[in-house]
Amino acid sequence: MTPRITATIDLQAIRHNLQRVRELAPHSKVMAAIKADGYGHGATAVARNLPDCDAFAVACLEEAVSLREAGVAQPLAVLAGVLSAEEAVAAQALDLQLVIHAEWQLQLLEQLQPARPLKLWLKLATGMHRLGFEPQLAAVLYRRVAAQAQWQFCGWMTHLACADVRDQQMSQRQLAEFAEALEGLGGPRSIANSAGIVNRLAEADWVRPGLMLYGASPVPDRSAAGLGLQPAMRVSSRLIAIKDVPRGHSIGYGATWTCAQDMRIGIVAVGYGDGWPRSLPNGTPVEIRGQRLGMVGRVSMDMITVDLAACDAAIGDEVTLWGSASLPVEQIATAADTLSYELLCGLTQRVRFRYLNDLRDTA
């Protein structure tokens, strides 16, 4: 069947972006975040195409199990740890690293007798007030983990709340609190996310890039291209109809757009049922034949309409929704008053994925 919407993933771009991470943090190991199905890019495909990545991070056990079943053998950290003893046993069998953030998790693990050591990170809450132990508990936690022969300590984590903003006072407070809590304690440290890497906030033993790995900028005041990143996802659809609409007639649900003059409009096969946000306003750009055109009328479940005045388009033409050099995902996210993360992760099952430069094709 001919796809209505295609997400084309350039795996070479992701490899390039990993190399860019290494250039920005040359003394750190890289734990690439591939949670939420690789930020919507396909976690298995991403992992298989980063054979030199030091480790990967996912959000939950289910994501880790899927990767192990696909043959991904690199170190794999579960950022939320485990929810039950059964999950802990499964994690041990799959040789996973668990990020432990709460007393109840430690108590759960202390009751187990694993066949081989459980690999644990300890997370400290230094400012997000989301997951993590209070920093003043670090020394007690360190001794407690060291006393367990069946545990292998991987290191310490925290997460920066405001690494993407120009004013770095919050980040500096978090870094100072993390350093003070760990003074005199051993173990590798992991702090920086993509924004932290770009802003050179904390080049610790490990960095954890996420968004920048996929070629989107993690900071609002610098473009991905300016950071040397390459977009990995290009989303496109097709023009499925062309209509001539007289002056004074309205377009779409709610009649929110009225033609100020006779208009030629194009109907594009994409809508909020595919992950194109309903919140996008009139004028949101798309590209047809290299021309930048504006959306008119409300987003429907399956379709949008665009003004074809500036383009001699034809039915069947490809429509770029985001991911070209001139139409990065950040622009669409800004128009929708959301984040690039949400768009990348929000494509639905109706979108067909196509992969370019897959290392498995050249093996």
Identify the role of each PLM range:
Residues 2-15, 19, 37, 63, ...:
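Active-site anion/phosphate-binding pocket segments in diverse small-molecule metabolic enzymes
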